[in-house]
């Protein structure tokens, strides 16, 4: 059986290479890595795994989360069939570092992944490496922001460059549309498609400085040609062509939306109107005096898009965000429907999550980069066949997703991970087994470096060069009152800071340096 399975895998890789060639897609994207598999007899009912992933989805922007505007029927349906984790967090509120943690189960400081331009080293194993070794066929279709395209471990991979080639001459139209208001939202640097070989050309003022990102508008690109639609089609094709009994697969279908620029296809742009939008209750009401300087500056200047200080422009941006979200939901629904049509849903663990959130006007902030709930919180639904749906309010981290899925699939880990499995919660949210605090980090080694711990009702953020933040999420879910400087919370601050430093002590600090509300003396 092992020999037969290896032959089937070789047949797949050969077929994939031929198919890619017919599409005009380079064969190098079907990586011919030959794992040493376990046999199906060892795990006759080993489940498939499908991970649906989006980019910049604010956790609260779902119908199932109580948002009256969000058009997310497919993700809502999945959430109602799953254990929905209401308090899930990313490890780093920016694309590439967060995705690296999801893929590897390691924190950013171990990966040395400091931003969108630094790849993690090939020595780090990914979720694909673990599942490959267990005999799974592993595929990644869509955005993963690898930076270095070889550090992934997947047998089969289609991403931005493959989509560009699918677009053919229309790629220039998309590059022009994207280049006017934004850098490319994590697109590969195909320099010849950008004006003056500059992916930031749409943001350049005459003096060379960067200007603002556009508020949003309807895309000029046909709906079928959008990246998310490409991801949905290719994911369905993978399921139709390569899903086999007793040959389990791990498929990550990773969508770009609702990441900015907020340019949904025409019909989704028309679904929402600025007049419908309700600005965040904290928009324009932040308590600036008790916030770190970096946050105050972002609120005051409305970084990248100063127009958003105007209520009408803020509502317009929200409408286009919801349009992008609706388009992504539609694409995710196509994949889920195909899974059911093919009868694969009965033995497939299905996950939905996002790499980080979007502030969407909370506290007057937009985009990501923050540890506030809108930015660092992520949606997370895990559907395990045979287990009842429920909600789970225990804080969990995406760094633990690899370990969790490995345990749920009886897949041995081939390398250590930082994340601790919460499979017990995915099976039974009422499980009495403990699951530790959640940690996050941002801008390692930079002046704005900060670290976060969420434990119980409290979230504590340590800024290396600024004042600390402490929020009681039970009584202050919108994070309007920073408690860190209040004497009655000193013990709470010190307890959380000790736990945070036990997890990771920033290199910028002296060994004995501990502070509560202000940076250490220099």
Model-flagged regions — what are they?
Residues 2-463, 468, 477-505, 511, ...:
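Formylglycine-dependent sulfatase
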